[in-house]
Each structure stands twice: as structure tokens, then as C-alpha cells.
Swiss-Prot record:
This is Glutamate-1-semialdehyde 2,1-aminomutase. GO terms for cellular component: cytoplasm. Its EC number is 5.4.3.8. It comes from Pseudomonas fluorescens (strain ATCC BAA-477 / NRRL B-23932 / Pf-5). Homodimer. InterPro entries: 4pyrrol_synth_GluAld_NH2Trfase, Aminotrans_3, Aminotrans_3_PPA_site, PyrdxlP-dep_Trfase, PyrdxlP-dep_Trfase_major, PyrdxlP-dep_Trfase_small. Its cofactor is pyridoxal 5'-phosphate. One of its GO terms (biological process) is protoporphyrinogen IX biosynthetic process. The modification N6-(pyridoxal phosphate)lysine is found at K265.
Length: 427
């Protein structure tokens, strides 16, 4: 029995399912989840001392690679001054100033401790600002596990939402309306019917929780136009895309400015951090300035601020994101060539340093239906073959992959060699 198998068996005694986040349990791909004990650069090492090229990157934060020495040094220095104060620090202001200088939509920002807190708070703020109750989200987009957002579409285009998790009251879920991603006509129809009741539209500008689906041409621009027309707050959930698709996030890359934005992952440099922010006239409705309450014991934690500030400064250097995107493009081109040579139906998607892999014969992946039509069983086999070859991909056919600036030529060649063997075995 491997060390991971032993640890997983032990973990299940007192941790539900043996994990603290469901995707880690390998339910989508089968087998025993790997337990890691070390990470450095582009690699993670499991409890059995096997090393893997890592394309999960702690689900996105590790854009510099693991254990970057400058980030570790910043955290060590802060450790000497304490772990948490529960009071304002100069670093919080530095972080707010830096984020507002980088991200087009940000005029004010509030720090929180997770992406879920950020999206939950942004929605409450939008409701408080507009005085409306309903929100619109999109199929396949995940915005954290707050009650408003664990909702799926009803049976018709204009029906109320229904809970997608036990424990979410139907009376609460009815205020969440779910529409197809990349379908601006559906949004236009919905707002024509109930626009006066809608507080906000929340969207991942690149849908990173149905693998990686970029916006169709005109989709984000259409959302901006319709929100302006109906007095609806437009929220970009940039927890994944922020500081990764471009330094200024997807909103900078695609040239569409939302009213509010949410961030997580990279902004903490690997520590638990999130934030939300946007237009001053909206943000001034947050307590203590306004009537919308939001608070957090560990918000702006000094260790997290130290890691996040160092990370954001390092990725701000000229050419950083071009290098990241170039590696990702070369990776995907190499995978596509090897899949084609093996006769395996395969298509990839990319947004800067994030990517999607689909076992599909489609020309492109644009909608939730396109995603669901891909072969998850083939991905499952591919995942385990790549794992055997020393490459760690996201353990789900519906999760995005991430590259880091630590990935280089050696990692690229190792990955492509493993993929060539894997595709050959899938024939």
C-alpha cells in the first residue's frame, strides 16, 4: 500500500470524504488522491517521494511556481512581527493601492480571506446598492459555495433557479437566475422580462470551472451594454483569471470594464486571500461608510499581504505574461500534435496562463453543452496515464489547468513525452 493510500484511509476517519475540498478526492477520475509533502518551482512531490510536473498550481495561485524564494522571504520577515493583529496595517493600504493601479475597474477595494467571501460580499453589495433581489449567473460558472451561487437553472429560460446543493433553501435559490454561458440573446430576453428586479450579473469572464471556456466575441461587451441599459451591476469573478490572463485580469485583456470585480488565488501568493472592489460610488455603500455589512477577523492578514504584495510586484515586470502565455501555447500545440498523430479526438482552449483539455471532436468549445459532450471517461484514462508519466493534471475533466513562470523547456519536453505515450495507449 502506498503512503498516499494509507494517509487517505486515515483521513477518512475524521474528515468527511478524507478531503477538505471535494475535487481533491479524485471522484471524477477514480483512484486514491495523492498526498503531497513538498512543492518547489514547477514540481510537486508526493508522500511516496514521486515528483510530478504540476499543472494544478494549487488551483491557480502559484503563477510564480511553488516556493518562490522572494515570496518565502517576505513571509519569513513578517513572521518575526506576528501572525495576525485584527487591526489595520500599512501593507493593506499598499495592497489596495497596487490593485487599484493594476486593474481597470478598481477605484476602491476590500480585502477578505477567500474567493467565496469575495463573490458573496460583492453580490450583497450589488443588492444593497440597487435595492433589488435577483441575480443572474451562467451555467458552468462557479463562484464559490455561498447559498446564492449554488444554484442551477430551472426547466425554462425564465424560470426561477433551483438549489444544486442540499441545504440551500428553495425560497432563497429562487432569486438566482441561471442562463447559458456565451448566449447574449438569452440575457437580453431575460432582462427584457425581469430587468427591473435584477441587482447584478455575475460572470467568470473566462469560464474556468467547466475546464476553460473563453468568452465568445461580443459576449462580455453585450453584458456591459445590457447592464448599462437596465441599471444592473456587472460583476466579473476574476478569482481565476485575475493577474493571470493579463496583469490587469480578463477585463484588461478583453477591454470590458465591470462595475465590481472579485479576486482570489494569485493575490495571496499561495496564502488564503480574496478581495472585491470596483466603482467608488458602489463601494462606499460598504460598512463603515454605508449600510451594507461585511466583516472578517482575518481580512488583510499580514502574512497574506506580504506574500501577495511580493507576488504582484514580481509578475508586474514587462514581458512576464507574454512568457507565460507563450509556454502555455507551446504546451497546447504540442499536445494537439500528438493527439492528432494518434488519431485521438482532442481540442484545447487557452486564456493566457490557463488552459482546457477536452476529448472532443468539436471544432471549438464555446458552450456548457460543448463541455458536457466531451468524453470524460477518456480524460480519466489520460489523467492516470499522465500521472504515471510524472505529470499532475487537474483530477477532473471540468477543471482548468494552470502554468507558471517556473515551467520551462525541461518541463515542456517531459510533459509532451508523457502525453505521446498516453495518447498511444488510448488508441
Amino acid at each position: 500500500m502506498s503512503r498516499s493510500e494509507t494517509l487517505f484511509a486515515n483521513a477518512q476517519k475524521h474528515i468527511p470524504g478524507g478531503v477538505n475540498s471535494p475535487v481533491r478526492a479524485f471522484k471524477s477520475v477514480g483512484g486514491t488522491p495523492l498526498f503531497f509533502k513538498h512543492a518547489e518551482g514547477a514540481y510537486v512531490t508526493d508522500e511516496d517521494d514521486k515528483r510530478y510536473v504540476d499543472y494544478v498550481g494549487s488551483w491557480g495561485p502559484m503563477i510564480l511556481g511553488h516556493s518562490h524564494p522572494d515570496v518565502l522571504d517576505a513571509v519569513r520577515k513578517q513572521l518575526e512581527h506576528g501572525l495576525s493583529y485584527g487591526a489595520p496595517t500599512a501593507m493593506e493600504t499598499e495592497m489596495a493601492d497596487l490593485v487599484c493601479s493594476i486593474v481597470p475597474s478598481m477605484e476602491m477595494v476590500r480585502m477578505v480571506s477567500s474567493g467565496t467571501e469575495a463573490t458573496m460580499s460583492a453580490i450583497r453589495l450589488a443588492r444593497g446598492f440597487t435595492g433589488r433581489d435577483s441575480i443572474i449567473k451562467f451555467e458552468g460558472c462557479y463562484h464559490g459555495h455561498s447559498d446564492s451561487l449554488l444554484v442551477k437553472a430551472g426547466s425554462g429560460a425564465l424560470t426561477q433557479g433551483v438549489p444544486s446543493s442540499a441545504g440551500v433553501p428553495a425560497a432563497f435559490a429562487k432569486h438566482t437566475l441561471t442562463l447559458p454561458f456565451n448566449d447574449i440573446a438569452a440575457v437580453e430576453k431575460m432582462l427584457a422580462e425581469v430587468g427591473q428586479e435584477v441587482a447584478c450579473i455575475i460572470v467568470e469572464p473566462v469560464a474556468g470551472n467547466m475546464n476553460c471556456v473563453p468568452p465568445a466575441p461580443g459576449f462580455l461587451e453585450g453584458l456591459r451594454r445590457l447592464c448599462d441599459q437596465h441599471g444592473v451591476v456587472l460583476i466579473f469573478d476574476e478569482v481565476m483569471t485575475g493577474f493571470r490572463v493579463a496583469l490587469g485580469g480578463a477585463q484588461a485583456h478583453y477591454g470590458v470594464t465591470p462595475d465590481l470585480s472579485t479576486f482570489g488565488k494569485i493575490i495571496g501568493g499561495g496564502m488564503p486571500v480574496g478581495c472585491f472592489g470596483g466603482k467608488r460610488k458602489i463601494m462606499e455603500h460598504i460598512a463603515p461608510l454605508g449600510p451594507v455589512y461585511q466583516a472578517g477577523t482575518l481580512s488583510g492578514n499580514p502574512l497574506a499581504m506580504a506574500a501577495g504584495l511580493t507576488t504582484l510586484r514580481l509578475i508586474s515586470r514587462p514581458g512576464f505574461h507574454a512568457e507565460l502565455s507563450d509556454y502555455t501555447s507551446r504546451l497546447l500545440e504540442g499536445l494537439q500534435q500528438r493527439a492528432d498523430a494518434a488519431g485521438i479526438p482532442f481540442v484545447t482552449t487557452q486564456a493566457g496562463g490557463m488552459f482546457g483539455l477536452y476529448f472532443s471532436g468539436a471544432d471549438d468549445i464555446v458552450t456548457f453543452d460543448d463541455v458536457m459532450a466531451s468524453d470524460a471517461n477518456l480524460f480519466k484514462r489520460f489523467f492516470h496515464l499522465m500521472l504515471e508519466g510524472g505529470v499532475y493534471l487537474a483530477p477532473s475533466a471540468f477543471e482548468a489547468g494552470f502554468t507558471s513562470i517556473a515551467h520551462g523547456e525541461a518541463e515542456l519536453q517531459l510533459t509532451l513525452d508523457a502525453a505521446e505515450r498516453a495518447f498511444a495507449a488510448l488508441k
